[in-house]
């Protein structure tokens, strides 16, 4: 499970050093793709296979499903981290997420998300205001 918030920087070759706690699960390979709210989703190769299998069950007769799957998969890039735990973030994904050098990497359970740090801080400030009031509405019975 991926947890926590980290603030690495992209190097001059657009490589991201993965947080040490994430490296073991991602060492065999990972997939980066477009995420919601203009972030990049990072899945382990195994988890991405599971996500893809769920997508395959979507009805091809649904234009909305086809459109989503096209955008999601066409932006995907499979990568293998190097021995130092670095992974290159492809230019189209950097552009999509507005990444420069300062990034925020968050653990989101089954995936990692890479955010432009300023965008993450803005998003978090907007969401924290309502956070304590929404737990029962969004996740009934969890807390």
Swiss-Prot record:
Keyword Transcription regulation assigned: yes
Entry GO terms, CC: cytoplasm; nucleoid
CDD domains: MraZ_C, MraZ_N
Pfam families: MraZ
UniProt key word Methyltransferase: no
Domain SpoVT-AbrB: 5-47, 76-119
One Gene Ontology term of the molecular function aspect: DNA-binding transcription factor activity
Gene3D superfamilies, alphabetized: Transcriptional regulator MraZ domain
Principal cellular location given in the protein's record: cytoplasm
GO biological process terms held by the UniProt record: negative regulation of DNA-templated transcription initiation
Disulfide bond entries: none
Subcellular location: Cytoplasm, Nucleoid
Superkingdom of the source species: Bacteria
InterPro entries: MraZ, MraZ_C, MraZ_dom, MraZ_N, MraZ_sf, SpoVT-AbrB_dom, SpoVT-AbrB_sf
Keywords: Cytoplasm, DNA-binding, Repeat, Transcription, Transcription regulation
Assembly description: Forms oligomers.
Family: Belongs to the MraZ family.
Name this protein carries in UniProt: Transcriptional regulator MraZ
Organism: Micrococcus luteus (strain ATCC 4698 / DSM 20030 / JCM 1464 / CCM 169 / CCUG 5858 / IAM 1056 / NBRC 3333 / NCIMB 9278 / NCTC 2665 / VKM Ac-2230)
Organism phylogeny: Bacteria, Bacillati, Actinomycetota, Actinomycetes, Micrococcales
């Amino acid at each position: 499970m991926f947890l926590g918030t980290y603030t690495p920087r992209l190097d001059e070759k657009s490589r991201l050093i993965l947080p040490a706690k994430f490296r073991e699960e991602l060492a065999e390979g990972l997939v980066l793709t477009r995420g919601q709210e203009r972030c990049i989703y990072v899945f382990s190769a195994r988890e991405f296979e599971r996500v893809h299998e769920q997508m395959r069950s979507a009805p091809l007769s649904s234009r909305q499903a086809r459109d989503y799957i096209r955008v999601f998969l066409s932006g995907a890039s499979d990568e293998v981290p190097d021995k130092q735990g670095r992974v290159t973030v492809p230019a189209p994904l950097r552009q999509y997420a507005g990444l420069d050098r300062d990034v925020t990497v968050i653990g989101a359970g089954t995936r990692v998300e890479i955010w432009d740090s300023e965008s993450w801080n803005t998003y978090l400030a907007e969401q924290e205001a309502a956070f304590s009031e929404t737990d029962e509405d969004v996740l009934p019975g969890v807390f």
